[in-house]
Amino acid sequence: MNVKGKVILSMLVVSTVIVVFWEYINSPEGSFLWIYHSKNPEVDDSAQKGWWFPDWFNNGIHNYQQEEEDIDKEKGREEEQRKEDDTTELQLWDWFNPKKRPEVVTVTKWKAPVVWEGTYNKAILENYYAKQKITVGLTVFAIGRYIEHYLEEFVTSANRYFMVGHKVIFYVMVDDVSKVPFIELGPLRSFKVFEVKPEKRWQDISMMRMKTIGEHILAHIQHEVDFLFCMDVDQVFQDHFGVETLGQSVAQLQAWWYKADPDDFTYERRRESAAYIPFGQGDFYYHAAVFGGTPIQVLNITQECFKGILLDKKNDIEAEWHDESHLNKYFLLNKPSKILSPEYCWDYHIGLPSDIKTVKLSWQTKEYNLVRNNV
């Protein structure tokens, strides 16, 4: 090849190199993709990574992360469902079966349950209230000789049988703190003692407790418990007094009157009294030795009863059965949401009829000649 031919060949080679280089620097894919441009469509950055890395590695990472996300979501759904289950209100027919006791009244005309042994499902109730982590309060008054005669046995038996397995606060009202006996309590129980002003007459002691309970609910009890019972001290727990008794407002059937006709009840029959209930009216006769409900409902009960007591004092009259007469008037106008059978406050002097399957709480022997002289 002559010199001219070599020059031409060299120029062609240089031109080709220049063209290739120019295409390379102006191509986003680079020289490798330019060479195979006709076989590879333009792809974005993520697709390039997928092409360069093995599929099994990329998919493995993705599935693992997705699995973790799915597990977290499932846990979240389970937690939300658990919270929803915990706050779902328990329906009456979930735990109550009135047909189990056909021989007695188990449902009122306003559809409130009357709780008798055998009518309730304890397991369902315990499971529900355990999730709620409830605290139940119990107020009791021991004035004068009631401290030495009744207080220790009442609290000791309550420690054993009242709301077992749940937090309980005993609110003990006395006129002499120095006389309160030491009582060893079980787990989940606490004891709070308050000194109250003594009254000259036992009738006034009985009636003034409505005022005192209301004051303590407002001051602290409403922030400390979910439910509250108020009981007389001259009683003894005989068996489990449990969560089947809890409700918005709870009334106790009086053992001596639960089978009587309303016209025979010892309601206050004088028109001058705020506790007046005329003949022909009334549902049941309720015992003031046991009543309860939520703190706000109990506050309303005590405040309304005390208003009636003050009105009677203003009119120089005293209801036949004092605070109990006013309590019966209250429940006539404000129907209780739950009623406890006489099994929950029984007097053994009546005997033990077939209606009474299990005595939960019983009256102590009344020694009025000893304990009512508080002057």
Swiss-Prot record:
One Gene Ontology term, aspect cellular component: Golgi cisterna membrane
Residues forming the catalytic site: 324
E.C. code: 2.4.1.87
Protein name according to UniProt: N-acetyllactosaminide alpha-1,3-galactosyltransferase
Annotated source species: Sapajus apella
Cofactor(s) for this UniProt protein: Mn(2+)
Gene it is expressed from: GGTA1
InterPro entries: Glyco_trans_6, Nucleotide-diphossugar_trans
Membrane-spanning intervals of the chain: 7-27
Ranges facing Lumenal side: 28-375
Notes concerning its domains: The conserved DXD motif is involved in cofactor binding. The manganese ion interacts with the beta-phosphate group of UDP and may also have a role in catalysis.
Keywords: Glycoprotein, Glycosyltransferase, Golgi apparatus, Manganese, Membrane, Metal-binding, Signal-anchor, Transferase, Transmembrane, Transmembrane helix
